[in-house]
Swiss-Prot record:
Protein name per the record: Sensory neuron membrane protein 2
Membrane topology annotation: Multi-pass membrane protein
GO cellular component, one term: plasma membrane
Function: Plays an olfactory role that is not restricted to pheromone sensitivity.
GO terms (BP aspect): sensory perception of smell
Expression sites by tissue: Principal component of the olfactory cilia membrane. Localizes to the antennal tissue with two to three fold higher expression in males compared to females. Detected at low levels in all body tissues except the female abdomen.
Cystine pairings recorded for this chain: C268-C338, C299-C362, C340-C351
Family, as annotated: Belongs to the CD36 family.
Length: 522
């Protein structure tokens, strides 16, 4: 009777061991993975959905302005001396409106951003502060004309003197709130013959930074008004219900799956990556070396490179940052050749030097983007200034910390600087003596750090995963011990052969029949 029970115990233990091995190697990981996928996919029933639709905390949107301190000297050919003023801090609220779902596991949506000035974070700075900056809209207009039809530059400049108020030089004295959101008024009601041409082109092109004035006679120029309280998109994004590895991937923007701003080149025109707010979980066995995001402001995808594994809020994270190869010149990265567009100067091939991005094909204005203070850009850009430009990795790089299990962004900052060329044009009085060079207007810092409430949710999830992992291996250990005990019990009961205790005897493996003639000594 005892033997029967022993054999039953052994059989049950063996089955439990097999089941435990299967669960440990495949079952538990699959169950956990499925549950995570269920929670983070973009679905009405998921934990992530409402947080994705309406981000539960404001992002930070900081603006730093380059104030010109030696205007008269620059007007007479001296190097510019700049003073960075900022941050002018804003709270940025984001809300998505779902437009519909596609059959290919996608969701279409628009994104609305709302900016509210944060006086506490801005300290002593005020939106009523007056600064002197490069006249961005004037330089954009005069450069466009000078590149397309140099012979009429002087005539058009006469019209621009009526279009812009007090146009004595290429610098704008302006309140911060007008430069950012409220707008600087420009007048189309003058009597210059070329003014109608200028205003007609503005009405036809409708650049984002120019919005029609209510009086019907002009426009308001501002850098960010088009971003505030307006719907951008629509975007079409993968929901991750069918393939979690594709979660967040943008497959179309404004109905286009390919950005033709850069011609027909597949490398430059493809939409690659997410909108930087959501990423798929990271496979620890195949950690991506690059993290792509689609940036509508520059009409292209950019990537951050993996630096390594780190820690944030006592949780493991992968740290990515913009590296020099992402902003490399054509000579350093031949693949970037398709971003070359002639616009920086009349004699330039449009293949910009290291560290700067051409925005002309994207914004229909000769603007140039870079990292703040020309970080990671060619040092020759720094030689143009007499002071005020000092690139610093800690202050000026773009980076992101990604939690691998859920793909949640623990902390991230996107930094971008807007520049335009200040060009010496002898036929234009305002530009006849100025030195030619790339001139920064301002830079932005946009990002977020998770609030304590969401950090606690993540920590609780990690704790629960730890318990599941412990149970996984505990069950396997118990099954192994039970199987070993039952095997020993069966062996001792004589139901299974065991290793002989006599040191002079031979193993039963080699001698299954100890009494046979094979083992006799002759």
């Amino acid at each position: 009777m005892l033997g029967k029970h022993t054999k039953l115990f052994f059989g049950v233990s063996l089955v439990a061991l097999i089941v435990s091995v299967i669960l440990a190697a495949w079952g538990f990981p699959k169950i956990v993975s499925k549950q995570i996928q269920k929670n983070i996919q973009i679905d009405n029933s998921s934990v992530m959905f409402e947080k994705w639709r309406k981000i539960p905390m404001p992002l930070t949107f900081n603006v730093y302005v380059f104030n010109v301190t030696n205007v008269e000297d620059v007007n007479n050919g001296a190097k510019p001396r700049l003073q960075q003023i900022g941050p002018y801090a804003y709270k940025e609220y984001r809300e998505r409106t779902v437009l519909g779902y596609g059959d290919n596991d996608t969701v279409s949506y628009t994104l609305k951003k709302t900016f509210i000035f944060d006086q506490e974070a801005s300290g002593s700075l005020s939106e009523d502060d007056e600064v002197t900056v490069i006249h961005f809209s004037y330089m954009a207009a005069i450069l466009t004309v000078n590149d397309m039809m140099p012979s009429i530059t002087g005539v058009v400049n006469g019209a621009l003197e009526q279009f812009f108020t007090n146009l004595t030089d290429p610098f704008l004295r302006v309140k911060v709130k007008d430069l950012f959101f409220d707008g600087v008024y420009v007048n189309c009601a003058g009597n210059h013959s070329a003014l109608g041409l200028v205003c007609g082109k503005l009405k036809a092109d409708a650049p984002q930074t120019m919005r029609p004035a209510g009086d019907g006679n002009g426009f308001y120029f501002s850098m960010f008004s088009h971003m505030n309280r307006t719907e951008s998109g629509p975007y079409e994004m993968v929901r991750g219900r069918e393939n979690i590895k594709e979660l967040g991937h943008i497959i179309s923007y404004k109905g286009k799956s390919f950005m033709k701003n850069w011609g027909n080149d597949m490398y430059c025109g493809q939409l690659n990556g997410s909108d930087a707010s959501i990423f798929p979980p990271i496979d620890e066995n195949n950690v991506p070396g690059k993290l792509y995001t689609f940036e509508p402001e520059v009409c292209r995808s950019l990537y951050a490179s993996l630096v390594g594994k780190s820690s944030m809020f006592n949780m493991s994270a992968y740290y990515y940052e913009i590296s020099s190869d992402a902003l490399a010149s054509k000579s350093a990265n031949p693949g970037n050749k398709c971003y070359c567009k002639k616009n920086w100067s009349a004699n330039h091939d449009g293949c910009l030097i290291m560290g700067i991005l051409n925005l002309m094909p994207c914004q229909d204005a000769p603007a140039i983007a870079s990292l703040p203070h020309f970080y990671l850009a060619s040092e020759e850009l720094l030689e143009y200034f007499d002071g005020g430009i000092s690139p610093d990795k800690e202050k000026h790089n773009t980076y992101i910390y990604l939690e691998p299990v859920t793909g949640v962004v623990l902390k991230g900052l996107r930094r971008l600087q807007f520049n335009i060329e200040l060009r010496n044009i002898p036929m234009v009085p305002q530009l006849a003596k100025v030195p030619t060079g790339l001139f920064p207007l301002l830079w932005i810092e946009e990002g977020a750090e998770l609030p304590d409430s969401i950090i606690q949710e993540l920590r609780q999830s990690h704790t629960l995963l730890g318990y599941v992992e412990a149970v996984r291996w505990a069950l396997l250990a118990i099954a192994i011990v039970a199987t070993a005990i039952s095997a020993i019990a069966v062996a001792r009961s004589g139901l299974l052969p065991v290793w002989p205790r006599n040191a002079n005897s031979v193993s039963f493996i080699l001698s299954p029949h100890p009494n046979s003639d094979v083992n006799k000594v002759h």
